[in-house]
Swiss-Prot record:
InterPro entries: DNA-dir_RpoC2_beta_pp, RNA_pol_beta''_euk, RNA_pol_Rpb1_3_sf, RNA_pol_Rpb1_4, RNA_pol_Rpb1_5, Rpb1_funnel_sf. The gene is rpoC2. It is found in: Plastid, Chloroplast. It catalyses: RNA(n) + a ribonucleoside 5'-triphosphate = RNA(n+1) + diphosphate. The lineage of its organism: Eukaryota, Viridiplantae, Streptophyta, Embryophyta, Tracheophyta. This is DNA-directed RNA polymerase subunit beta''. Belongs to the RNA polymerase beta' chain family. RpoC2 subfamily. Its cofactor is Zn(2+). Keywords: Chloroplast, DNA-directed RNA polymerase, Metal-binding, Nucleotidyltransferase, Plastid, Transcription, Transferase, Zinc. The keyword Metal-binding applies. SUPFAM superfamilies: beta and beta-prime subunits of DNA dependent RNA-polymerase. GO terms for cellular component: chloroplast; DNA-directed RNA polymerase complex; mitochondrion. It comes from Aethionema cordifolium (Lebanon stonecress). In plastids the minimal PEP RNA polymerase catalytic core is composed of four subunits: alpha, beta, beta', and beta''. When a (nuclear-encoded) sigma factor is associated with the core the holoenzyme is formed, which can initiate transcription. Binds 1 Zn(2+) ion per subunit.
Length: 1385
């Protein structure tokens, strides 16, 4: 009784963890027998109390957490803000998805943590609480779904469903939540069935690998160990894991604290000793593990350590391999059952945050960080090395170290409040997460035209397609507008920016705008209008060519151009772009008439022509053939010239064709029908047979002409030709027939006819020899082409009115596009152009102007009597200016800079258009389509544009409309002029050019002195293609600049010929995001593009921005029309797989089967080469490789152990490291024999044990080359020393056949092979104590060797080799002898 009085009475609730700890202490103090007696009493007590309590469970016991309401409300608020950011184009869809998941995941986790304290305070004896937290039934996550919130669910692929279930099962689910819940729960049910079988198979493979590992010796005598220290370079190891790692291990080295030895080598560690190490703060402790054991196919007691069952050193004969395999496999079977209850609820992970401890100012070194975006799209700083951040408050200075690759979310010198998040530690910094690459497709919400605000380049695997890569973060814009496709004729009189009545605008996908019967009169009216009467007709006159008076040294080439190509500069990112001429109609000379699609002008993208470049080309329809054939030049050969300038690239790649310059005035075309068929096609005609027209050649092809059939079989295809013509069998006397392939002019007789008929046309004679003896002649018809006289330039381009000196000449050159005797092949339903007429630009080289080596092309918009016309002007420039292509980014704009302003954007003022703009009216914007047959028009109706203004700080003369002032955002309706603006030019007495400078030459001032007449503009102005506006009002000295929405006053003493350009505030074509404010008190803009800039207001075409980050793939070309639902962008991002054990088990399997998880970095090979070079340089050849191989193996072993442990720990499963180490040791202990050397012992490519390879090398006293290799558990099972064990696992026939051929011997060392053959197993009682004998003497020698301060780099190399030999001879030889003796007996 006296003893009991000293006992301390603890009145405390203990949970499962505390009971575990109590039992382990009891075993340490009292041993197994007494402990089991105590535990029996505890069990009886527990059952008594449980029976007395009799817990009941009712629905009222499920108490919802009170803080849930405002937590969910807060998460919804954050989601709403996120949605707005996405709408404004600040974050893209992937960032939005990520952040949304993290918001809801954090809310759900917080609710789960609140649950336990809530129960403990309000109702500690709540049956739900008692059951789940005692571990009797259910766990925290299941109870959380009952009383917290069900949260985010995974779909069957393990992907997240981003709509969270906010209710819990107690409150009940809404219909949507119920469907999502069933979706996830089904995944749980299916997974359970599949994973159970997977887990069983995993256990079988694991046991297979390690079944032969038995404890067969007390000490293998190794001098190696693995050091464990509580403080690592990167992080602190938690005390719990540190204790778990050390308990039950055996020390590999003596441990000193100061000069005192506290523990000696080969001593096993108990809890007392480990606690003493922690107290004294020992730096590193070297322990023995299965990795360090020197035994080849079993393990020694010291390297294994204590047995987990009874807490003493493991007994000899214990089958530790099978225990290890089952310890790892068994939790897999258990854990699969857990998923059933949680029902596919998503369990992910969020990043850790560093918070400020109190209010203060942040200070850090800005040179060590650089700006970036977080994965949620927030601005942040990324630090590459450890960054010290100092928080200064009034009286304290606190320093925080932020690890590398973390995000700093605050700026330098920023004031932070207490608990504010200042940094985010990246999730993947310390933890091992299985990531997968996922593609996310973003689809267009609306129909419209695609623009982008930065240069993009082609994705490497899609060089010639419409997939582009985004190099830096930028916006993609979809400009609104309905598309309408039609033939060229219907809209040929409408130009860009015209207004027209849209009779029928189909919004359906890719439909063609069709005019109904009722609207025929409307279209008729367009065409029959009298073009001379410009006032009445709503259509401006485009059919005549107007001359232009030139007042400078430029030469003007006169032609109106199609305006739909006005944004070609932005679209074509190739060498040059095309502008087709408008149709040129000459009434008198019908010969000269050319279709307007025929002539194309090729202008380089920088607008600069070199000498002798092709300026324009024309494909004459007379030289066009539908059929295939052969081209012959007749007698005179032509020079082959290749001019790379002749090829125009258009949406794809073209190989440069050879062009043949003509010296002949005629050439011949011999037609033939050619079919190229696949190998497998059935041909229904014979070679050298004669067929009629419309004969069936194959199942679905009929011949177009009749004649002789030739069938040639080539690689993977059959070429079938049909030659039309007459067949003649010549006499021996005919000489001509011997020459095959000649042309015979008209007037000559046929070579073999007895009657001398005259040949009317040219013919082509071809000799055909079906067999050696037999031949005949085929006479084929020939089409003759004469090269016509060159086109008269005067008809194409009117003469210069001022009769100036002509610097620039145009030469007409004809090119034949195919060589002599070359076959021409047409693709189906296309015609072949044989001759191309080109205009070549040339000019005289003056001595004075020797620097004028280039011509520059300009676009000019000139207006006469209310009509605006577009011209190309080609002028000579000095070459040194031409390469300066500078963009003027205004410093003070504060808005989007004018980088992506369209250089060829022009707004055409037309006096004649006075239609009222009703709902069904629209403005045409043409754009280039790949299909040349039809044009697509983009029609902007009034719903696509809105008007901003007037702006208060702008001074203007005439107030346009009082009603506009009251409501700044007005949809444009029923105002006159294009898009509701009255544009009218009066006082245009005579007609003169408006000189403009192209953007490429940077000129600071706009010259206005050429304007002899006063240009008076009422509320409107002229705009050229650069978006510049010239406005001279003599009364006010005001120059309106389009780039600023304000006026610029000229001083009286200012030189009157120049007005200065000012920086831009709003420029044409500029993009705005939503809610940007331009003027100080002006309204907030909607997102869009500035279409019309007026004195006091701006018209904006609505547009939707999409954010694209680097590496995103854009589908489509610049300026292309996209329809609703088209794929716009593909984002590729890394995503952590959810940490459910349903995904966890495959992770373990993935590691054990050594499948690669992450993509390997490209420069890994370079690093390995570098490492090999340096280490061999330091240590010399043999030792360098040895150390390198050893380090590789050790490092990969430790890494594999940590990865597997991490997966199990994340599920709350504790597995001792030594079980995993035994498995990992087996999959890393094989090496692959290389080609060089060792040929007399092992075959190249053979897998042998690492220790065996080392010993063989020492025995042979020669270098042995092998590579360390990681084998998966399946391959390791099929590469053991026992072929019986391998055959009983998989591929029985193959393994046995191979073993028989090689004459393998099975020594029956493992358990499995003995079971198969019905013998006793060499483990437990069947383990023969006399099997291994190690004398005391040898052990002493080893210990003496160890006490010498042995270091690899201090002793002589010879000593080390000697030591190795002696060590192995002493420890191995006797054991080998005894083992062989045992087997013989």
């Amino acid at each position: 009784m006296a003893e009991r009085a000293n006992l301390v009475f603890h009145n405390k609730v203990i949970d499962g963890t505390a009971i575990k700890r109590l039992i382990s202490r009891l075993i340490d103090h009292f041993g197994m027998a007494y402990t089991s007696h105590i535990l029996d009493q505890v069990k009886t007590l527990g059952f008594q109390q449980a029976t007395a309590t009799s817990i009941s469970l009712g629905i009222d016991d499920l108490l919802t957490i009170p803080s849930k309401g405002w937590l969910v409300q807060d998460a919804e608020q954050q989601s709403l803000i996120l949605e707005k950011h996405h709408h404004y184009g600040n974050v893209h869809a992937v960032e939005k998805l990520r952040q949304s998941i993290e918001i809801w995941y954090a809310t759900s986790e917080y609710l789960r943590q609140e649950m336990n304290p809530n129960f403990r305070m309000t109702d500690p004896f709540n049956p739900v609480h008692m059951m789940s937290f005692s571990g009797a039934r259910g766990n925290a996550s299941q109870v959380h779904q009952l009383v917290g919130m069900r949260g985010l669910m995974s779909d069957p692929q393990g992907q997240m469903i981003d709509l969270p279930i906010q209710s819990n099962l107690r409150e009940g689910l809404s219909l949507t939540e119920y469907i999502i819940s069933c979706y996830g729960a089904r995944k749980g049910v299916v997974d359970t069935a599949v994973r159970t079988s997977d887990a069983g198979y995993l256990t079988r493979r694991l046991v297979e690998v390690v079944q032969h590992i038995v404890v067969r010796r007390t000490d293998c005598g190794t001098i190696r160990g693995i050091s464990v220290s509580p403080r690592n370079k990167n992080r602190m190891m938690s005390e719990r894991i540190f204790i778990q790692t050390l308990i039950g291990r055996v020390l590999a080295d003596d441990i000193y604290i100061g000069s005192r030895c506290v523990a000696f080598r080969n001593q096993d560690l108990g809890i007392g000793l480990v606690n003493r190490f922690i107290t004294f703060g020992t730096q590193s402790i070297s322990i023995r593990t299965p990795f360090t054991c020197r035994s080849t196919s079993w393990i020694c007691r010291f390297c294994y350590g204590r047995s987990p069952t009874h807490g003493d050193l493991v007994e000899l004969g214990e089958a530790v391999g099978i225990i290890a395999g089952q310890s790892i496999g068994e939790p897999g079977t258990q854990l699969t059952l857990r998923t059933f209850h949680t029902g596919g609820v998503f369990t992910g992970g969020t990043a850790e945050h560093v918070r400020a401890p109190y209010n203060g100012k942040i200070k850090f070194n800005e040179d060590l960080v650089h700006p970036t975006r977080t994965r949620h799209g927030h601005p942040a700083f990324l630090c590459y090395i450890d960054l010290s951040v100092i928080i200064e408050s009034e009286d304290i200075i606190h320093s925080v170290t932020i690890p590398p690759k973390s995000f700093l979310l605050v700026q330098n010198d920023q004031y932070v409040e207490s608990e504010q998040v200042i940094a985010e530690i990246r999730e993947g910094t310390y933890t091992f997460r299985f990531k997968e690459r996922v593609r996310k497709y973003i689809y267009s919400d609306s129909e419209g035209e695609m623009h982008w605000s930065t240069d993009v380049y082609h994705a490497p695997e899609f060089t010639y397609s419409n997939v582009h890569l985004v190099p830096k973060t930028s916006h993609l814009w979809i400009l609104s507008g309905g598309s309408c496709g039609a033939s060229l004729i219907l809209f040929s009189i409408h130009k860009d920016q015209d207004q027209m009545n849209i009779p029928f605008l189909s919004v359906k996908r890719k439909s063609i705008c069709s005019l109904s019967v009722n609207n025929d009169q409307v279209s008729q009216k367009f065409f029959s209008s009298d073009f001379s009467d410009k006032k009445k007709s709503g259509i401006p006159d485009y059919s005549e060519l107007n001359g232009i008076v030139g007042t400078s040294h430029y030469n003007l080439i006169y032609s109106a151009i199609f305006h739909e190509n006005s944004d070609l500069l932005a679209k074509r990112r190739r060498n040059r772009f095309l502008i087709p001429f408008e149709s040129i109609q000459e009434q008198e000379q019908e010969k000269e008439f050319m279709p307007h699609s025929g002539i194309s002008i090729a202008i380089p993208i920088n607008g600069i022509f070199r000498k002798n470049t092709i300026f324009s080309f024309f494909d004459d329809p007379r030289y066009r053939r539908k059929s295939s054939g052969i081209l012959k030049y007749g007698t005179i050969e032509a020079d082959s010239i290749i001019q790379k300038e002749d090829m125009i690239e258009y949406r794809g790649v073209h190989k440069f064709k050879k062009n043949y310059k003509m010296k002949v005035d005629r050439f011949f075309f011999i037609p033939e029908e050619v079919h190229i068929l696949p190998e497998s096609s059935v041909i229904m005609v014979q070679n050298y047979s004669i067929i009629r027209v419309d004969t069936r050649i194959t199942l679905n092809i009929r011949s177009q002409v009749g004649g002789l059939i030739r069938v040639e079989r080539k690689k993977k295809r059959i070429e079938l030709k049909i030659f039309s013509g007459d067949i003649h069998f010549p006499d021996k006397t005919d000489k001509i027939s011997r020459h095959s392939g000649i042309l015979i002019p008209p007037g000559r007789g046929k070579p073999n006819s007895r009657e001398s008929k005259k040949v009317k046309n040219w013919i082509y004679v071809q000799r055909i020899t079906p067999t050696k003896k037999k031949f005949f002649v085929l006479v084929r018809p020939v089409a003759t082409y004469e090269i016509a006289d060159s086109i008269n330039l005067a008809t194409l381009f009117p003469q210069d009115l001022f009769r100036e000196k002509n610097n620039i000449q145009l030469r007409v050159v004809n090119y034949i596009l195919y060589g002599n005797g070359k076959p021409t092949r047409g693709i189906s339903d296309t015609s072949i152009q044989l001759v191309r007429t080109c205009l070549v630009l040339n000019w005289d080289q003056d001595n004075k102007n020797s620097s004028l080596e280039e011509a520059r092309a300009f676009f000019v918009a000139v207006s006469t009597k209310g009509l605006i016309r577009d011209f190309i002007r080609i002028g000579l420039v000095k070459s040194h200016i031409s390469y300066i292509r500078k963009r003027n980014n205004p410093p003070d704009s504060g808005l989007i800079s004018a980088d992506h302003m369209n250089p060829f954007y022009s707004i055409s003022p037309k006096a004649g258009i006075q239609q009222s703009l009703s709902q069904n009216n629209g403005t045409i914007r043409m754009f280039l389509n790949r299909n040349k047959e039809s044009q697509f028009l983009l029609i902007l109706s009034s719903s696509n544009c809105f008007r901003m203004g007037p702006f208060d700080h702008v001074k203007y003369h005439n107030v346009i409309n009082q009603s506009i002032k009251k409501n700044p955002l007005i949809t444009i309706k029923n105002a006159s002029g294009p898009l509701g603006t009255t544009i009218q030019i009066s006082n245009f007495y005579s007609f003169f050019p408006l000189l403009t400078y192209n953007k490429m030459s940077v000129i600071k001032y706009l010259q206005l002195d050429n304007l002899k007449q006063i240009l008076k503009v009422i509320n409107s102005y002229l705009i050229d293609e650069n978006g510049r506006i010239c406005n001279r009002d003599p009364y006010s000295n005001v120059v309106l600049n389009p780039f600023k929405l304000n006026w610029y006053f000229l001083h009286q003493n200012y030189h009157h010929n120049y007005c200065e350009e000012m920086s831009t505030l709003i420029s044409l074509g500029q993009f705005f995001c939503e809610n940007v404010c331009i003027a100080k008190k002006g309204p907030h803009l909607k997102s869009g593009q500035a279409l019309i800039v007026q004195m006091d207001s701006v018209v904006i075409r609505s547009a939707k921005p999409y954010l694209a980050t680097p590496g995103a793939k854009v589908h489509g070309h610049y300026g292309e029309i996209l329809y609703e639902g088209d794929t716009l962008v593909t984002f590729i991002y890394e995503k952590s797989r959810s940490g459910d054990i349903t995904q966890g088990l495959p992770k373990v399997e993935q590691v054990l089967e050594v499948r690669s998880i992450d993509s390997i970095s490209m420069n890994l090979e370079k690093r390995i080469k570098g490492w090999n070079k340096y280490i061999t340089g330091i240590l010399g050849i043999p030792w360098g490789f040895l150390v390198g191989a050893e380090l590789t193996i050790v490092q990969s072993r430790l890494s594999l152990v940590n990865k597997i442990q991490k997966v199990y720990r994340s599920q709350g499963v504790q597995i001792h490291n030594r079980h995993i180490e035994i498995i990992v040791r087996q999959i890393t202990s094989k090496v692959l024999v290389s080609e060089e050397g060792m040929s007399n012992v092992f075959l190249p490519g053979e897998l042998i044990g690492l220790l065996r390879a080392e010993r063989t090398g020492r025995a042979l006293e020669e270098a042995i080359s092998y590579r360390a290799i990681l084998l998966g558990i399946t391959r390791a099972s099929l590469n053991t020393q026992s072929f019986i064990s391998e055959a009983s696992f998989q591929e029985t026939a193959r393994v046995l056949a191979k073993a028989a051929l090689r004459g393998r011997i099975d020594w029956l060392k493992g358990l499995k092979e003995n079971v198969v053959l019905g013998g006793g197993i060499p483990a437990g009682t069947g383990f023969n104590k006399g099997l291994v004998h190690c004398s005391r003497q040898h052990t002493n020698i080893l210990l003496e060797k160890k006490t010498k301060n042995f270091c690899l780099f201090e002793e002589d190399m010879r000593d080390i080799l000697f030591y190795h030999r002696e060590f192995f001879d002493s420890s191995i030889s006797k054991f080998e002898r005894s083992f062989l003796g045992f087997n013989d007996s």
